[in-house]
Swiss-Prot record:
Its main location: nucleus. One of its GO terms (cellular component) is nucleus. Residues 84-109, 211-249 are annotated as: Disordered. Residues 94-109 have a biased composition (Basic and acidic residues). This is NAC domain-containing protein 6. Transmembrane segments: none annotated. Keywords: DNA-binding, Nucleus, Transcription, Transcription regulation. GO terms for molecular function: DNA binding; DNA-binding transcription factor activity. Residues 109-162 bind DNA. Residues 4-156 form the NAC domain.
Length: 281
């Protein structure tokens, strides 16, 4: 096998595929590095694709043999049987029929196709993410995948909604229980406040009674104090009267002494009286 430079890629034109590779396969049975395989035997993603470094990514080339479909008509059996959970499908070409012409051929020249030239075809498969599974993909595959995805999503959504309903019912039950507990607490608080109000009322009544009794006691005490003060005032007045009488009596005695001894000096307390009218000889 010829060794190609590193980085070489198999990028033939449609005309090159027909003139070189398909013609060599039909006339000389030379397939080079293109494998012969019935690509319609299974799903495209389950085929034993070759790993050829010359092919571009997600691109493959195969020689596909034709089969008889009644009489001498040769065609490709495109149906894929059901497998697993899939209902099967049909291969189809996305490009349709396209004529490949050699620009060097002149008008009138042609090649009559014999039966031998119709026993094999050259197929190119490409994987397209945004479009179909591949250029010759199954028609029903994407529909089944979409249906399965929608069914799974619907099941998940239903489970989520059921879980949401269960959570809402639980939250509602919790709120109901909390409301009942709160109501019970408030009722207990009211029952507790009523005895406290009664106790405060009784305490106020007792305090009022005590104050009234204290006032009643203060009134006799004030009356007793008034009588005592009057008695003290009378005693003080009597004492002052007695002192006044004593003073008057003492003054009378002093006058009598002065009268009886007019020429003598008398010492009366701290006072000394001298008779200046007397002259010593």
């Amino acid at each position: 096998m010829k060794i190609l430079p590193v980085g070489s890629r198999f990028c033939p034109t449609d005309l090159g595929l027909v003139r070189l590779y398909l013609r060599n396969k039909v006339e000389r049975n030379q397939s080079s590095f293109i494998t012969t395989m019935d690509i319609h035997q299974d799903y495209p993603w389950l085929l034993p694709h070759v790993n050829n470094p010359l092919f571009n990514n997600n691109e493959w080339y195969y020689f596909v043999p034709l089969t008889e479909r009644g009489g001498k008509i040769l065609s490709v059996h495109r149906k894929v049987a059901a497998r697993g959970g899939s209902e099967g499908g049909t291969w189809r070409s996305n490009d349709g029929k396209k004529e490949i012409k050699d620009g060097h051929m002149q008008k009138g020249d042609g090649l009559r196709a014999s039966d031998d030239l119709q026993k094999v075809v050259l197929c190119r498969i490409r994987y397209k993410k945004e479009a179909n599974v591949n250029e010759f993909g199954l028609v029903n595959h994407q529909a089944h995948q979409t249906q399965d995805a929608l069914t799974g999503f619907a099941d998940q959504l239903e489970m989520m909604l059921e879980g949401q309903e269960d959570r809402e019912q639980k939250e509602e039950a919790d709120l109901t229980g909390f409301a009942d507990s709160l109501e019970t607490m408030l009722e207990g608080q009211e029952d507790h406040e009523q005895p406290e109000d009664a106790d405060l009322t009784g305490f106020a009544d007792s305090l009022e009674t005590m104050l009234e009794g204290h006032e009643d006691r203060e009134q006799p005490e004030e009356a007793e104090l008034t009588v005592t003060q009057q008695q003290q005032q009378q005693q003080q007045q009597q004492q002052r009267q007695e002192d006044c009488d004593v003073t008057q009596e003492q003054e009378k005695d002093d006058v009598m002494v002065l009268i009886n001894n007019p020429n003598d000096a008398l010492a009366l307390g701290n006072y000394e009286i001298i008779d200046l009218t007397r002259v010593d000889k």
